[in-house]
Amino acid sequence: MELYECIQDIFGGLKNPSVKDLATSLKQIPNAAKLSQPYIKEPDQYAYGRNAIYRNNELEIIVINIPPNKETTVHDHGQSIGCAMVLEGKLLNSIYRSTGEHAELSNSYFVHEGECLISTKGLIHKMSNPTSERMVSLHVYSPPLEDMTVFEEQKEVLENS
């Protein structure tokens, strides 16, 4: 079975899903890493490849490819909740808190192949690939992404005395 058909079967009937529903459904895709290969895009307008492969009124599914030593911007997902499963490599997920126009780093952790990360409504984060191999992940958001906010990362300034 092709990835699109698996997604339709697994996600097509979901109505107003929770983060747990999204994670459970993602993990049900058989051979997700292999089935996702034809949908992996190289970077174009962003520092990473992004391919929206499925969308209905309830959710949107995207394949993300972050090349070695690249990262996303610091962002939120608007009014959407989400879940992402790492299919290849590992990613560093950095959580931020808003300080107005800027965002301040709060916490970071690695997500390894086969593991999921969740995004609750209002979560601000950045995904990075600090390794020498690409990182590929499969993301599902509900409702479909709209009105995302990109934040300027607040860097620590060290003073010389």
From Swiss-Prot:
InterPro entries: CDO_1, RmlC-like_jellyroll, RmlC_Cupin_sf. Optimum pH is 6.2. GO terms for molecular function: cysteine dioxygenase activity; ferrous iron binding; oxidoreductase activity, acting on single donors with incorporation of molecular oxygen, incorporation of two atoms of oxygen. It catalyses: L-cysteine + O2 = 3-sulfino-L-alanine + H(+). It is an enzyme of class 1 (oxidoreductase). PANTHER family: CYSTEINE DIOXYGENASE, CYSTEINE DIOXYGENASE TYPE 1. Belongs to the cysteine dioxygenase family. This is Cysteine dioxygenase. It comes from Bacillus subtilis (strain 168). The lineage of its organism: Bacteria, Bacillati, Bacillota, Bacilli, Bacillales.
